[in-house]
Design a protein with these regions (language model features):
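Sec-dependent N-terminal signal peptides
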Residues: 4-14
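Stable alpha-helical elements in mature extracytoplasmic
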Residues: 33-37, 43, 69, 86, ...
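A short, structured surface patch at a secondary-structure boundary
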Residues: 25-88, 99, 183-186
Length: 200
């Protein structure tokens, strides 16, 4: 059980070991998740800046994704900015500055994960690596789900942020994992007025 949950926790973070390879495209990632996907595809050389919480082991400029403006990003001359949340009007600003961007909100299910990996693969010219990763993930997830036996198991998953404490329901990726495993998520009964998947 512990091994299975560790793998699925890694799926949530989508983290993998980086390697070296040069690419011409210059990317700013304002999303920890997508920084990790880029590294897992061995395309970290495309990164010229990342958000403050991304885990990288190479020198790169750090940016506060919550407060940064498009005007502050423009001098870095990125070819692409990856955005997970439209904080501080960043999307409108990027459009005003004519900076290419892609908005990839937090994945709510497995298919979102696969789709976003494929999208990142296209951006960094690693479509083959992305396809292989998605295939391997599907095989491993199916193996885990086939072996899963969590009858009469319930869970409450709490996430703490600087701006409040939240749980997760079935409209989130974490909640999707619990549902797939047959684990009862007690937060599914909590009110989620915005349909975010993260009821307070």
């Amino acid at each position: 059980m512990k091994t299975k949950l560790i793998f699925l926790a890694l799926l949530v973070s989508m983290c993998s070991s980086p390697a070296q390879e040069s690419e011409d495209i210059k990317i700013i990632s304002l999303s920890t998740t997508h920084t990790e996907i880029i590294q897992s595809l061995e395309a970290q050389d495309t990164l010229i800046a990342v958000d403050a919480f991304s885990e990288v082991d190479f020198p790169v400029e750090r940016i506060d994704a919550y407060t940064v403006t498009a005007e502050e990003l423009a001098p870095l001359n990125p070819d692409m900015v990856i955005v997970a949340f439209d904080f501080n009007g960043i999307v409108e600003g990027l459009e005003s500055q004519e900076i290419n961007y892609v908005l990839l909100p937090p994945a709510k299910n497995f298919e979102d994960v696969y789709s976003q990996i494929s999208t990142i693969g296209e951006i960094v010219n690693k479509k083959g690596a992305a396809s292989s990763k998605v295939r391997d993930m599907k095989l491993e997830i199916n193996r885990i789900l086939d072996d899963a036996n969590y009858e009469n198991v319930s869970v409450y998953h709490e996430i703490g942020y600087s701006y409040g404490i939240y749980s997760v329901n079935s409209d989130s990726l974490i909640g999707e994992i619990y549902n797939a495993l047959g684990i009862v998520n007690i937060a599914n009964s909590e009110e989620d007025p915005f349909g975010s998947g993260y009821p307070a």
